[in-house]
Amino acid sequence: MESNVNDEIEKAFAKDSELAKDIIKQYGKTKSIQPLVHRICKYINTLQKENESGQVKEAGSLKRKDRVQHELGQLVYGVLNLSFQAPMRKKLDVYIYENGIAVTLPGEPNLIEFWLPWNEIRCAIHVPCPRKANVQNNFVIILKSESSAENIVSSDNVKEPVFFTAPYPLKKLNLVEGLRSFTHCTNSWDIFRDYFEFIGTSTLSPSVEEFVCPNPQTGDNGTTYGVEANYKAKDGHLFFLRTGILWGFRKPILFIELASIQHFSYSNVLQRTFTVNFEAGGTIYSFDMVDQSVFRAVNDYATKHGLMDSSLAEEKAAPVPKNPSVSYLNEASSLENVDDMDDIDVKEPLFSDNDEDVENSDSEDGSESIGSEDEE
């Protein structure tokens, strides 16, 4: 019996013989841990058998060989060693098949981490990767959802977006050719967009016709599209696209379709920054610390797409600072236009004894003190 136990432990921890010896030693000394050791060994050995047999990790009873032959179709092309941030943070390989996208472990084309059929992909978004010394492309794949609020996509949702980064130049990509070659491509976005559009999957990317940020950034490849903006105290970037607005790239990644936006407004308007608010699906999404230099570009985009809502804008607008001198000038102007002073009903004197104190106090309060913006 003891020999069988030792074999079971050694098999489960074959890659670390010293650990196996320590577990065997403790197993003999402590009876209370013996049932737990059996369960752990059984679990590890079962996983090893599944990997050896090539069983698919996700739900389903098909083995990999059957899946490759009957579900994926033929290989169109592959892009290896890409940096994924969602739904997991790791380096993975991407294989584009006739029937969908297979994301696999590096160097293991048959070890599929997750599978994205074409009919479950809603759209693919490409934006430049901001604040990078080397130019890179960010890719966000939006999945279809049965939710009634599918026009508002967040990585907090059950079907969170798939997000990965690829080098911009073609020469830095590790490519695998299949049914299609890359002779007509100039960068990593060309490769993905080419086939996405071929099969009818919607694609989105920034354009100078839609929105350009006036503040140059590192890694923008000549034209800046991303606007620095905080969401729930997390720093990130807003991208104003043809059919929606993307915020990333901290979790949650957000994509709000223009068609779902009920109200749009500005708030917290200060000397250097302001806040942009979008109400969609009954929720207000506020993006803070937007630089005043991009106000005109944001306002032009909102106007172009009919997002302006005067009622909400007035409700959420920053209050006008009190200024007694303005009030006085208005009253003085009205007095100049009156011929007969007897017609004026003056209920209170224009000045009080402490007006000078009030004016000085308001002057001090009126000067905004802008603190330094903390970087996360």
From Swiss-Prot:
Keyword tags: Meiosis
Residue ranges with Acidic residues bias: 353-376
Chain positions covered by the region annotation Disordered: 334-376
Example GO biological process: DNA repair-dependent chromatin remodeling
SMART domains (UniProt xref): Rtt106
One annotated GO molecular function: nucleosome binding
tRNA processing keyword on record: no
One annotated Gene Ontology cellular component of this protein: nucleus
Stated role: Has a role in meiosis.
Family in the record: Belongs to the RTT106 family.
Name listed for the protein in its UniProt record: Meiotically up-regulated gene 183 protein
Species name: Schizosaccharomyces pombe (strain 972 / ATCC 24843)
Lineage: Eukaryota, Fungi, Dikarya, Ascomycota, Taphrinomycotina
Name of the gene: mug183
